[in-house]
């Protein structure tokens, strides 16, 4: 236990919590340009070809972003919007691509959870 005199000389410092998505710099979303669009395999015990994109953000950061949903139209030089949110079985992927914003098209023929995939309401 510190004495009052010690605390007067050197007060207690509060712990600084580290952000899980530092590249966003306290913004809800960030715009960026795809530098590479590719597939990668998840950690054990899962097996798939997950679609990801390497993105150069407007603030200079280069991050990896997951592309959710079935099928996408992204390629190199596509301008996309990313949000926070990691993918548990892909190490180093801490961002999600926002579907239906900028150059990234929404998922076609999506019926449920449409707002998460940028899909308009179907007719009928």
UniProtKB/Swiss-Prot annotation:
State the UniProt keywords alphabetically.
Answer: Methylation, Ribonucleoprotein, Ribosomal protein, RNA-binding, rRNA-binding, tRNA-binding
Q: An example Gene Ontology cellular component term from the record?
A: small ribosomal subunit
Which Gene3D superfamilies does the protein's record reference? Nucleic acid-binding proteins
Q: Which InterPro entries match?
A: NA-bd_OB-fold, Ribosomal_uS12, Ribosomal_uS12_bac
**One GO term (biological process):** translation
**One MF annotation (Gene Ontology) recorded for this entry:** tRNA binding
SUPFAM superfamilies named among the record's database cross-references: Nucleic acid-binding proteins (SSF50249)
Query: Could you tell me which residues carry 3-methylthioaspartic acid?
Result: 89
Q: Which Pfam families match?
A: Ribosom_S12_S23
Region called Disordered, residue ranges: 1-23
Regarding protein family, the annotation reads:
Belongs to the universal ribosomal protein uS12 family.
Q: Which NCBIfam families would you find in this protein's record?
A: rpsL_bact
Protein function:
With S4 and S5 plays an important role in translational accuracy. Interacts with and stabilizes bases of the 16S rRNA that are involved in tRNA selection in the A site and with the mRNA backbone. Located at the interface of the 30S and 50S subunits, it traverses the body of the 30S subunit contacting proteins on the other side and probably holding the rRNA structure together. The combined cluster of proteins S8, S12 and S17 appears to hold together the shoulder and platform of the 30S subunit.
On subunit structure and binding partners, the annotation says:
Part of the 30S ribosomal subunit. Contacts proteins S8 and S17. May interact with IF1 in the 30S initiation complex.
What is this protein called in UniProt? Small ribosomal subunit protein uS12
Look up and give the organism this protein is from: Pseudoalteromonas translucida (strain TAC 125)
